[in-house]
Every structure is written in C-alpha cells, then in structure tokens.
Amino acid sequence: MSKDSLTALVWFRQDLRTEDHIGLKKALDSGLKVIAYYTFNPRHYQNLSWGFKKTDRFRAHFLVQSVRELKESLKSMNISLIIDSKPPEIGIIEYLKKYQVRQIYLQHEWTEEEKKEEQAIAKKIDTSIKWYRHYDQFLFHPNDLVFSRDQIPEIFGIFRKKCE
C-alpha cells in the first residue's frame, strides 16, 4: 500500500474548530491524506433517565451552525468533513475501512460515554491503526498540575491560587 493511498482521520467531537487544534495540525504534519469526521450521535438526542435530552433544540441548532462553519473552514484547507448521524462505534468504522485510515487524531476525553465509544471502536478495528489523543480543552494541561487529580480543589479561586 502506497503512502498516497493511506489516510489520517481527525475525529471531531466537542472541539469543533480548526484554529489551534493540535490533532488537526498533527494529522496535517503526518504526510498522509487528511479527512475529518463528525457525527450527530443519535444518543445525544434521546431522552435521558432524568426526563430530558442531552441535546435539545437550542444546543442542536448551535451544533448545526458550528458543524457548518467547521465544514467551511476545513474545505478551505482542502479537507473533507464527513458528517454522519450514526453512533460513532458504527459510523466511523465504515469510513476507517473505506478511506484506508491508518491514524486517528482525537481530543483526549475522560468521561465514561466517550471512553466507551473509543473502546467499542478499538475492539472492531485493525490494531495497526494508530490512535493519537491530545489534551486540547484545558486551561492547564493535566501533566502541568502541581497536585494529584484527587487533590484538585472544588473551588476555582483556590485552584487558581495553587496554580499561580
């Protein structure tokens, strides 16, 4: 397989921007063809056990606008954005195969739902596909904290003073 036929995929989830996006920059630096993926995950639009949706109409409208802007921004970089409406552990698998994806770039998430999605995908794909996760959503990188995760203050003012 020639390097020209191999692809890097940037998986957009909560990080719908192109400026200062570490994963996107690293994918572009990889030398592989780059495509992007976003799904309007149907689970986000279902009623939760608390009786409301994780994503209701105002947030959905905002997401549609954000994804539209992301698509235009990526287009100006000559990158196609695949917009899907399947759960990622189903939808993304199809595109990994179709585009011979060898590298996946994504924001490192820590919540249970995102971790389960990643684990479900990892179980279904070729182990030669490399995952590149990055922290891109914090004021402070977790490795730069001067205390352990279980010692993080619950009040931001105290947290800030410990970090200064």
For each feature predicted by the language model, list its residue ranges.
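Trp/Phe/Arg-rich N-terminal binding region typifying the photolyase-homology
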Residues: 1-164
